[in-house]
UniProtKB/Swiss-Prot annotation:
GO molecular function ontology, one term from the record: tetraacyldisaccharide 4'-kinase activity
Name of the gene encoding the protein in the UniProt record: lpxK
Reaction equation(s) it catalyzes: a lipid A disaccharide + ATP = a lipid IVA + ADP + H(+)
Protein residues bound to ATP: 68-75
Name the UniProt record assigns to this protein: Tetraacyldisaccharide 4'-kinase
HAMAP family: LpxK (MF_00409)
């Protein structure tokens, strides 16, 4: 059913199939979509009018989110931002909802050896890649307050554009440059969390892949040498044969296309749902279809405890043109200077 809904959202299928999907989904989803839109607008208006008061942190808050459901490449942008700010001498911290994790309490501080079972995959990935303080909580303001105890001077939120209970200074929206906004309908009739009008209010639009449109900063994900999930050994993907590829991300075909662009044709491509938990038995069985199992870095953080010696992941880095990157970092630094010292 999920696959059919995605086909309906993003189209580009034979007319007969699209007609069938319209007949199936419009009567059920249209009223729900209208209700979703009404509730979303009403909730945001309450914070804009002051009926509800958002938590304002004593340091700048930067939100990296999107207006569509699913993965658009937000986490690589968060990692990029953290690394750029660290290079400038700032001390960023990251907050996340911790989707897919079940921590014993909230807020919860992510450490180097924290399990994804507790906090989800993205927070663990961000912590291991950057070394920055990361805290998770469904109530993001609680996570922010925890990070303030760890000497941070900028807060970056991984997702949370629609979490208006947390006041923010700068907003990023990451756009899937290939799929864009689908049929431009609100959930569940389409993939939108908010209407496209919302894009006019954000500070930076980042287009992940595809052709960037007006006012969008182009970005692509640059893969590097494979890393062995178990040993940390590095090698070129072209050194491996009979690869089985797997991806448990928002849009698995993006990862499989990356492998093709690297000149690799997997013997099998296995998509999984985003944030899916994996078992050792399941992945061992999958790997037996070839000689090597290749996955995303986001999947790898969930497999370290039981990884086999023929399991590899492809690390990727967000690449943004220098002119856009300079404008982004200078804007954050300017806001930081306006705040002054968090201890002042």
């Amino acid at each position: 059913m999920a696959a059919l809904i995605e086909k309906f959202w993003f189209g580009h299928h034979p007319k007969g199939l699209m007609l069938l999907l319209n007949v199936l989904f419009w009567p059920v989803f249209w009223p729900l979509s209208k209700l979703f839109g009404f509730i979303s607008v009403r909730r945001r208006n309450k914070y804009q009018t002051g009926e509800k008061v958002a938590y304002r942190a004593p340091v700048p808050v930067v939100v990296v989110g999107n207006i569509t459901a699913g993965g658009n490449g937000k986490t690589p942008v968060v990692v990029w931002l953290v690394e750029q700010l660290q290079a400038k001498g700032l001390k960023p911290g990251v907050v996340s909802r911790g989707y897919g994790g079940k921590a014993p309490h909230y807020p919860y501080l992510v450490e180097d050896k924290t399990s994804t079972d507790l906090v989800g995959d993205e927070p663990v990935l961000i912590r291991r890649r950057t070394g920055a303080p990361v805290a998770v909580s469904p109530i993001r303001s609680d996570a922010v307050m925890m990070l303030l105890e760890h000497d941070v001077d900028v807060i970056i939120t991984d997702d949370g554009l629609q979490h208006y209970a947390l006041a923010r200074d700068i907003e990023f929206v990451v756009i899937d440059g290939q799929r864009r906004f689908g049929n431009q309908q609100l959930l569940p009739l389409g993939p939108l969390r908010e209407t496209c009008d919302r894009l006019a209010d954000v500070d930076f639009l980042i287009c992940n892949g595809g052709k960037a449109q007006k006012n969008e900063a182009p970005m692509h994900l640059q893969p590097s040498a494979l890393i062995n999930v178990k040993t940390g050994e590095r090698c070129s993907i072209n050194e491996l044969e009979n690869i089985v590829a797997m991806a448990g991300i928002g849009h698995p075909p993006r990862f499989f296309k990356t492998l093709e662009e690297l000149g690799v044709t997997p013997v099998h491509c296995q998509p999984f749902t985003d944030h899916q938990a994996f078992s050792e038995t399941e992945l061992k069985h999958l790997a037996q279809q070839g000689q090597h199992l290749v996955m995303t870095e986001k999947d790898a953080v969930k497999c370290h405890a039981f990884a086999q010696s023929n399991w590899w992941y492809v690390p990727v880095d967000a690449v943004i043109p220098t002119s856009n990157a300079t404008a982004i970092i200078n804007r954050i630094i300017k806001v930081k200077e306006e705040y002054g010292s968090p201890s002042a």
